């Protein structure tokens, strides 16, 4: 019986999942973007290199899908549609899910809509939640959400993803789980800005709470259940990403608070900042649906150089008082 898994995307999260799931599969095929990435993985991910000699096989060809029972996409949102286009003829009905967060940058759609465009015969499934890749590799306990409208698909992937250290919950609200996973990255930039400006716990609490309200408003407008945002993929992921410097988005915000340019801040992070990629898309979707997202709006203005971090905070504080 085939007991192999293909993970497409050999960044921090894809690599962490390969390590975490390596005891559950005979083989895990980790597909890197190109040969250059393949050659450098051993030095970039020391924990991965230790597992490589066992049952994690790193390559750059999608042909390994033929030897796998399921496929998990772990690429940035900017690569999501191109990956689907490349593999759609190789799946042959095999289960597929993704851990990618964000909106499709080409269309502004949630990723399950892009998925349905390329793979209409499959049930879309997203896996999301408050998880830092580094802590997953270190086998620190965590919880995650498997979301799909299809009950069998949820059950299948929750069984795959759950380990002794990673607890999987299921949710039928695939829209809400995706919105939470995308918007929290934008709000983490705001939290980083606040931290970089020297503000304290009061400010962080206000940002997280009011940020959650913005996330919920947008999600409900797109058809999500507001209860979803009280769970792991909403509040849980938001608290994690806003509160710890393992978050690239938070670190990016702290860089912006030092009054350097957006380009320089991105260079200093030297890794994918999904919140920055999602920012314009989130605000476009919000405006199209007439949803107020003042915190996210100010983050956008800061990244565009249209206001300073301090001015953004002042603008938020001077807004007309309103009911919570």
Regions found by a protein language model. Give the residues of each.
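Conserved hydrophobic helix-helix packing surfaces used for dimerization/oligomerization
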Residues: 4-5, 96, 144
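Rossmann-like NAD(P)(H) cofactor-binding subdomain of soluble oxidoreductases
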Residues: 51-139, 157-159
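Alpha-helix C-terminal capping/helix-to-coil transition sites in glycosyltransferase folds
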Residues: 66-67, 183, 235
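General beta-strand structural signal in soluble alpha/beta enzymes
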Residues: 98, 123-128, 168-172, 230-231, ...
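NAD(P)-dependent Rossmann-like dehydrogenase/reductase catalytic/cofactor-binding core
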Residues: 191-192, 220-230, 234, 238-324
